[in-house]
Amino acid sequence: MKVGRNMTNQQQSAAASSDLDLLDRYWRAANYLSVGQIYLLDNPLLREPLRAEHIKPRLLGHWGTTPGLNFIYAHLNRVIRALDLNVLYVCGPGHGGPGMVANTYLEGSYSEIYPNIARDADGLRKLFRQFSFPGGIPSHAAPETPGSIHEGGELGYALVHAYGAALDNPDLVVACVVGDGEAETGPLAASWHSNKFLNPAHDGAVLPILHLNGYKIANPTVLGRMSDSEIRDLFRGFGHEPLFVEGDDPKLMHRIMADALDVAFASIRSIQQHARDGRKNIERPRWPMIVLRSPKGWTGPKEVDGKKVEGFWRAHQVPVASCRENPAHLKVLEDWMRSYEPEKLFDASGALVPELQALAPEGNRRMGANPHANGGLLKKELKLPDFRSFAVEVPQPGAVTGEATRELGRFLRDVIRLNAQERNFRIMGPDETASNRLDAVFETTERVWMEPIEPYDVHLAQDGRVMEVLSEHLCQGWLEGYLLTGRHGFFSCYEAFIHIVDSMFNQHAKWLKVTRHLPWRRPIASLNYLLTSHVWRQDHNGFSHQDPGFVDLVANKKADIVRIYFPPDANTLLWIADHCLRTYNRINVIVAGKQPAPQWLSMQDAATHCDVGIGIWTWAGTEDAGGEPDVVMACAGDVPTLETLAAVDLLRKALPDLNIRVVNVVDLMTLQPQDQHPHGLSDRDFDSLFTRDKPVIFAYHGYPHLIHRLTYNRTNHAGLHVRGFAEEGTTTTPFDMVVLNELDRYHLAIEAIERVPGLATRAAQVKQQLRDKLLEHSRYVREHGEDMPEIRDWVWPGKPG
């Protein structure tokens, strides 16, 4: 709907003209500080004529979006004060970082965190100088920025972060600015459907503010060129009621924006009151949103060098580029900055004048001081059941079969039960919770769903702890927003398709890396991934579903941020899941299978093994006590572990005098040197496991080069021979998948024979028998369409003799 100047407004927070005049001055102050950050080294209040030496040598920053962000921030302040609201500001166009810094400085929250940036002339000088400057602060709404949970550097995730923040925060309103450039991204386009998962009875609200300034870096935006009627139809289709605020006259725009926000917050209040009156079922509401059309680079130079700037893409970054070298440009900049009348905004000391300071909310109501933007302040410890009570009984290694993720599902079911009252734990997944065998969680909760529910639907409810949507972007974004505001969660996904959020993982890892060096940023719960339906058991879906490379990306990140785990069975998975849910400020990646598989370790043995992260399985090897093996058979991952033990079984029977050591790796980062990762083994401990000179046949779940990379500086790296996924795949049998990649028991046993000095000649007949088995396998699967009985029915025989 259009919100006009003449509309009747009886809301509590209706703004008088005098209030709007003050608000305009506040907005001008924010704009002035934003320009100053981009351009000035000195002379922050223009108390002397602007000279070239006052200008930064490198002009960095983005002006175009910033005046719109400042306009929104100032108006939200008015409504927060009038209605005592709890509002979190998510700045989608994070490149408008000068505006976020300016507003938190004006309200005082910035100087409270950074007392060296005082609220006076010297503080202003430091504020300006530090922006996008060596040793200073970044150009975006980075973790260094008070009030930010969203950097907005890589575009696409603002709205989904906002919804994640609103979940289970019934008193919170998340005002989310969506730039019209960001609105063109895939994740943002999908994010509009998040309102189908927001329950107004238990969750907070999200107020999207679509900022149509019409341009990106050098092109118009799609939404910016659409008509109001098209915009209205589009967003009504998404379930919103658009409120249009359009124009370029500040005086008129202040009135229209004030009215629009009054209507929007009244609508939110009405929706929530209706939902919270005790009714059992709620009809999905039509939530309000603001559509703000304002010029890009609003209030800046209209032209520079005879070329259009305001209202065009030339305003995107630095509209006046050569102020040091070009006196005409310097004059344009000075006129521009003086147009804000800084002498009427700041007092003699350089502080914001009292009547403008009074416009900011107080205490934690200031958006820069909202504790939800520093979620560690609000984080409560997750209540966890005793993982040992879910143990699979394993009387002997390999004696029983189990489904690792099914056991994990029972553990997660009880995590949900124990934290039901706190409402601070959610499971996200792209329609895969049941497929990944975690469906025990549905014994205690449902999938949240605000769309109509049919009588024949299964495990759908308006209140649930499981969120499923066929968008890995939304699952990741909801979880990030949830974690950043102080809660806990778990993301289960097919291994191959977690690549869809590679870049989101990157950005979250960068955020965590920076927060490690900001003492005021309290630790948040870790982001926990379960990657299952993995490469070795996607034989039914084929090559498109077979990719274990996500962990390669994870391993690139800072060692104090990432962990990678390959539990070989259910009990190790339970220990690791419990451990990961207790950690903070990390990203934990767990790769585990869901199919029936041999169970190797009792819970006590699993706990001992996982606590170290790597170890010798003495029960599997044949080496003499106190001696060195002839060969080390190492493994990481459930299927590589199975194939390694099957290979050891073949070798034990065929070559009983061969001394074999079996090493299993659960925590992949133990392979790195101790000085590169806190979990890394010392060289001495590494050599004690892998020897200094004996051949090591390493069966690895993923791409082999990662193991070589992690162990590059180890003594015996030259003796390390890694087999893993070789990018061979199709729709075939489970065992044929490992054969195609030469990770099967026969290839592993053959390589062991070839690598032990002198053994290849002595065991030539054994090697030929193993090769014959590979030919037999190939013929059998192509004739029968399933693996040979000796493969399907193989069990670990226990100790020889």
UniProtKB/Swiss-Prot annotation:
A Pfam family annotated for this UniProt entry: XFP
One GO biological process term: carbohydrate metabolic process
Documented EC number(s): 4.1.2.-
Disulfide-bond pairs as recorded: none
UniProt keyword Lyase, yes or no: yes
CDD domains per the UniProt record, alphabetical: TPP_PK
Obligatory cofactor(s): thiamine diphosphate
Keyword Lyase listed: yes
Protein name per its UniProtKB record: Probable phosphoketolase
Database matches in SUPFAM superfamilies: Thiamin diphosphate-binding fold (THDP-binding) (SSF52518)
Domain of life: Bacteria
Keywords per UniProt: Lyase, Thiamine pyrophosphate
Family (UniProt): Belongs to the XFP family.
Enzymatic class: lyase
Annotated GO MF terms: aldehyde-lyase activity
Organism the protein comes from: Bradyrhizobium diazoefficiens (strain JCM 10833 / BCRC 13528 / IAM 13628 / NBRC 14792 / USDA 110)
PROSITE patterns: PHOSPHOKETOLASE_1, PHOSPHOKETOLASE_2
